[in-house]
């Protein structure tokens, strides 16, 4: 078949390998590269191991509930409560609740012990929490679970509505179980979920602090969150740097299983959280991100989720030292920017068996995040690149299928981020790039299957290209065009890998 070629290294259409420097006269120059034969077998690796997911079930989550002792609830002032400090501090946040409650603000507090929502409602005046229809409850105050307390919103609850007008929200400083139910931010004025209308408008939210456990199972969370700190939607967060030394809490954790998250500012956010499991969920039409693990979170399992319709940015993003995690078997599609992103020094992660398609930017994007394995993913029909890698070293792209992306299948480059809005002290980086690309298929990508600028090391082996876009078929251009004969000899006749390095002076 004329349009099918399989070789040890096959670069169809256009493969650019360039590095730019500046001479004393200020002229840009492109140093030469050496292209040499290398054995291919040492590049082969075993299929990576993935975590056993069989233990993360509704039954296992329910088994974690301690029903005794019984808890108690009371209404008290919000002031001088550590778990509320974030929400009554600077930038007139206290004023938000004063205006909504028309008094010095108070909240519902669950003290040590177990309560379900029905028990909680029975213990409180209806002005704070009431049943408006069988199984439907409206909360008009914040609800705070204190250390040692457990709140269970269970299947006897058809829906818990957190009043937008009343300024209700959920703070977990103990244990929270949301199972087989629905929890919505609620507009009493519109008698509907508090659908997103404009940036900065208060909407109820959930935050679980350091030392807590959160379990959301077979449930729907709708219209949570806005722009204020730790009020993003569904958040699992260690206490802030100013509070953490005082609180001395271990990192928070939780499971989110087989649930739906719709119209939230962030579908999920975490900060310095460990061992969170996000499994089998749907993140639909969220505003900024679908799934957004952040700052120094570790050992996360993000598996079998659908993240789609995100309106401002990405479906799934791991940002700022989110390490040692598994992003596996997800689908990220129809998002405003990229499907899956690793960002700001997120390293030692496995991104495998995912599908990213019809995103308005890249299928997958790696920014300043080295030493990650991208294994056997599919990126199809994205508006820019299948996989983009920037300022990242030790990135391994193995057995990926990259098809019909508007620009390139794989795009690697460096970029000087000085002058951007990046805080270079908080997020340092090196403008270096090294890639190993082994196996997989690149099919009908728009401008080229692979384009790489300024690598410090590039290894390619055993790639398959189908249906090259250009009428003249296979052609090497740029620096590789100068050595195309030697390159094809290495790849076609010797069936070896190609090692591409900058020429040393």
Where are these regions (language model features)?
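C-terminal/domain-terminus segments
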Residues: 455-471
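Eukaryotic tandem repeat interaction scaffolds
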Residues: 323-433
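Bacterial N-terminal signal peptides
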Residues: 8-18
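Bacterial N-terminal signal peptides that target proteins for export
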Residues: 1-9
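Pro/Ala/Gly-rich low-complexity, hydrophilic intrinsically disordered segments
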Residues: 212, 476-479
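Conserved, well-structured beta-alpha core segment at the onset of a catalytic domain
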Residues: 3, 24-27, 449, 459
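Beta-strand/loop edge motif enriched in small/polar residues
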Residues: 24-323, 332, 340-341, 347, ...
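Exposed, low-structure sequence patches enriched in small/polar residues
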Residues: 391, 452-455
């Amino acid at each position: 078949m004329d349009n099918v070629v399989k070789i040890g290294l096959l670069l169809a259409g256009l493969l650019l390998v360039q590095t730019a420097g500046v001479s004393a006269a200020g002229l840009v120059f492109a140093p030469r590269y050496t292209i040499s034969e290398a054995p291919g077998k040492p590049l082969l690796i075993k299929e990576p191991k993935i975590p056993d997911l069989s233990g993360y079930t509704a039954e296992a989550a329910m088994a974690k509930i301690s029903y005794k002792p019984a808890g108690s609830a009371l209404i008290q002032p919000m002031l001088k409560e550590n778990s509320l400090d974030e929400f009554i501090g600077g930038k007139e946040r206290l004023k938000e609740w004063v205006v909504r409650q028309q008094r010095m603000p108070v909240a519902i507090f669950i003290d040590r012990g177990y309560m379900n929502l029905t028990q909680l409602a029975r213990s409180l005046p209806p002005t704070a929490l009431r049943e408006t229809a069988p199984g439907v409850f409206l909360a008009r105050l914040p609800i705070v679970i204190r250390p040692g307390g457990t709140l269970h919103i269970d299947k006897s609850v058809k829906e818990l509505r957190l009043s937008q007008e009343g300024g209700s929200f959920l703070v977990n400083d103990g244990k929270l179980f949301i199972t087989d139910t629905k929890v919505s931010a609620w507009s009493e004025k519109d008698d509907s979920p508090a659908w997103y209308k404009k940036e900065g408008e208060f909407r109820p939210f959930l935050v679980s602090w350091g030392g807590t456990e959160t379990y959301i199972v077979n449930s729907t969370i709708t219209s949570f969150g806005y722009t204020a700190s730790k009020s993003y939607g569904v958040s699992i967060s260690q206490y802030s740097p100013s509070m953490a030394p005082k609180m001395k809490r271990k990192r928070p954790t939780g499971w989110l299983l087989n649930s739906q998250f719709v119209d939230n500012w962030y579908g999920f956010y975490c900060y310095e959280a460990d061992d969170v499991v996000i499994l089998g969920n749907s993140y639909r039409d969220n505003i900024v991100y679908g799934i957004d693990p952040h700052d120094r979170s570790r050992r996360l399992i993000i598996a079998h989720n659908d993240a789609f319709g995100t309106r401002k940015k990405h479906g799934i993003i791991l940002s700022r030292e989110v390490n040692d995690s598994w992003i596996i078997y997800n689908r990220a599609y129809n998002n405003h920017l990229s499907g899956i992103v690793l960002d700001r020094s997120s390293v030692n992660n496995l991104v495998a068996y995912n599908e990213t398609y019809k995103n308005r930017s890249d299928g997958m994007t790696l920014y300043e995040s080295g030493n990650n394995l991208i294994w056997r993913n599919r990126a199809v029909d994205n508006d820019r690149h299948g996989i983009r890698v920037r300022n990242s070293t030790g990135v391994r792209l193995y057995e990926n299928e990259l098809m019909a992306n508007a620009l390139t299948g794989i795009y690697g480059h460096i970029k000087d981020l000085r002058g951007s809005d990046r805080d270079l002290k908080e997020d340092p980086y090196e403008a270096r790039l090294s890639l190993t690309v082994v196996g997989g298929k690149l099919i009908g990508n728009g401008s080229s299957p692979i384009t790489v600028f300024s690598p410090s090391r590039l290894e390619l082996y055993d790639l398959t290209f189908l249906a090259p876009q250009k009428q003249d078929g296979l052609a090497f251009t740029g620096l590789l065009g100068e050595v195309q004969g030697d390159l094809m000899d290495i790849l076609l006749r010797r069936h070896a890998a190609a090692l591409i390095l900058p020429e040393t002076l």
